[in-house]
Amino acid sequence: NQAYADMSMQSTRHRDMFKISEKIDMSEKLVYSFPMATYSPDIPYNELPPLPPAEVVETVPVLKAIIDAKEKLAELRTACQLIPNPEIITSTIPLREARASSEIENIVTTNDELFRAAWHVDAEPSPATKEALRYNSALHAGLSSLSQRPLSEKTAKIVCSTLLDTPAEVRSLPGTFIGNPVTQQRLYIPPEGKEIIEGHLAAWEDYIYSNHDVDSLVKMALLHYQFEAIHPFYDGNGRTGRILNVLHLIQEELLELPVLYLSGYIVGNK
């Protein structure tokens, strides 16, 4: 959350509401026109700049990290191909990811509770366990969607709807903020207004398939940042974003199976 503030304070404060002025067809690409972005933690960041960022993101340290990350992903992909029965890991690692990703949102269950519920050992799982199980269902709903259509805003809605067990709606009411819920101190207020948020989501989706010649892992990070900054839904944005990361890696053929346990690292390195 603080990263949103730190990366945005370089622009000057401006209270004019942003509007998408037009879509321009340039070389068969949709280009969204936005005014100069400005930021204040006290007002909705309706002027959130679309991707790509103006700053250079593929720095030497980033590129070195990408080489290492891709080597590890290739090893994981090969290991999955060599396992005679991949279901051994596809039935366990996504559940561990579901538990850890839910824990990031303070939805806490144990591996034992989760596996017992997944295998129908317990008649009535706890509410937290049910939520973690829905994360697993949302991941598989996203995979199913990916087999029918490319990654998109629609994918995000399918994933979030499965997570919440109710249709996910783009926020139309004000009041969402990132910060301290007790003191009400705000670090970041995401864009507000359904049309404004939908405009940001449309630009986010366009960037997925734009040719900006950035590495697929860098693109994943940028897309994740932008999705969380848009914060399009009333609930489930963080978990939805983490599932979209895995789906992006599969779409880019850096993974074959959803067996990347990223949330466990996040929980262990807060």
Model regions and ranges:
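FIC/Doc superfamily catalytic core
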Residues: 1-270
